[in-house]
């Protein structure tokens, strides 16, 4: 988070969301858990990482957000990391699985909002 003094901490996704949500017309979902030993992220399904995905999507949907949501799984491959290799089928399956997980998370959130 370059808005903080050095040494900069990792950006807090919820804090960031609170500053941009009124200007957001698109939500891009990628979730992960930071591994300081590797100095890199372990990517997860949406809502399973430290990206506050559930909280952010719930806030957005409860506030009437009805625009686009895109995914960037990084589970099978990472475009900027040549060390991760996967077949075309594995990449395809990863995107489908990630999309289904996001759909399930959104359905859960919608039920939570309805029951609130």
Task: Please tell me what each predicted stretch does.
Residues 2-116:
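Histidine-acidic metal/acid-base catalytic patches
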């Amino acid at each position: 988070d370059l808005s903080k003094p050095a040494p900069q901490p990792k950006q807090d996704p919820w804090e960031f969301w609170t500053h941009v949500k009124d200007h957001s017309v698109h939500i891009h979902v990628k979730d992960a858990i930071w591994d300081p030993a590797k100095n890199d992220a372990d990517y997860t399904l949406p809502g399973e990482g430290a990206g506050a995905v559930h909280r952010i999507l719930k806030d957005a949907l409860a506030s009437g957000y009805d625009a686009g949501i895109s995914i960037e799984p990084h589970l099978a491959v990472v475009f900027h990391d040549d060390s991760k290799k996967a077949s075309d089928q594995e990449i395809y399956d990863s995107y489908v699985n990630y999309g289904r997980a996001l759909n399930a998370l959104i359905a859960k959130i919608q039920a939570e909002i309805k029951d609130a």
